[in-house]
Amino acid sequence: MDILVAHNFYKQPGGEDQCVAAEVAMLKAHGHNVIEYHCHNDATEALGRMGLASRTIWSRSAFYELRQLFRTHRPQIAHFHNTFPLISPAAYYAARGNNIPVVQTVHNFRLVCANALLFRSGRVCEDCLGKAIGWPGIVHKCYRNSLGATSAATAMLGVHRAMGTWRRAVDVYVALTEFSRNKLIEGGLPAERVVVKSNFVYPDPGPGSGAGGYIVFIGRLSAEKGLETLLDAWRLLGRKPRLKIIGDGPMAAKVKEAAQKDDTVQWLGSKPLEAVLESIGEAAALMLPSQCYENFPRVVAEAFAKGTPVVASGHGAMATIISNGYTGLLFRPGDAPDLAEKLEIILADPITLSHMRQAARAEFVRNFTAEANHRTLMAIYEKALGGSNPEALRPVSCEW
């Protein structure tokens, strides 16, 4: 199959970028011809505020570049990942103008929330969910604490809602979990065209041993990731192993301070994927104490691949991905004493931990391998090719 894959890469590489790269590699390994179209957020600095806002709503350059690619290569499917801010929904119309079905993987909550997190002021927030215009987000400057940036993101959502883009220009939306699917539907996406396909890991890194005995956190060092809760819980523990924190972000100074005060806390900064996988495999457990809902962090699939159980906040997608007491443990979000109690369970009972390791690896083999993902993705492409969208735009020539 000939497939065009488009993605707007982030300034700070993260799990979403890795997911796209893994999916492209998996498609190529299965014999598909993949045409790649990329933008990178490093280019935003040269655009200026007005130029970036305009491109967020309708990127003329992405439209024309993609139109040319569609005409040259004639792919059977156009598969979009992140289109914000440099690709924009204009890309769908470039595909539609060439009668090419559109699949959109939704890696976050950007289509229903200006900051893509459903999170504000230290708490889960759904104030804009289902609104034609997300004015609460503008009032609170939810995206980058900027009125201009939030207004641009909100305008993009509102303009394309008014144009019917979300309803008519996309054949299939791919949510990463059932929880995320439900939130996207609450936000206005057509239920019959939102399907679920989880993240996966390719190639399979193989199980680790857990022999390191430490706890590891991997991710962006920011408030929504629950680092305050993790550090508070760590202070409540009696005898404790090492806590390795891998990543960078706005809370780096606070993490560094915690490491200076407690020699069991180690901040390792950002690490390449190979080192991250090794750290996960040797850990007793992976920590995911997020205050926000999360969607499907790739690091969870990586932990399961290595046979490492996950201790996570028991809300949002995590409550559906992690089987409590089987592939990991869930604690009450933001509750440091409850998290400390769950860590004590993990650390005190090697037999339970061994069973969890086996269960986590089995969950990976069952649901998160490249083979399982490829089967699901092919079914999604068949759905898109089968004309699953009765409201679909007819081929148009849009010259904005």
Model-derived regions, located:
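Conserved acidic donor-binding segment of nucleotide-sugar-dependent glycosyltransferases
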Residues: 324-325, 329-336, 345-351
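Nucleotide-activated donor-binding/catalytic signature segment of Leloir-type glycosyltransferases, i.e.
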Residues: 253-274
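Acidic donor-binding loop of glycosyltransferase active sites
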Residues: 281-295, 308
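Short alpha-helical segment that forms part of, or immediately flanks, the ligand-binding pocket
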Residues: 277, 295, 300-305, 319-320, ...
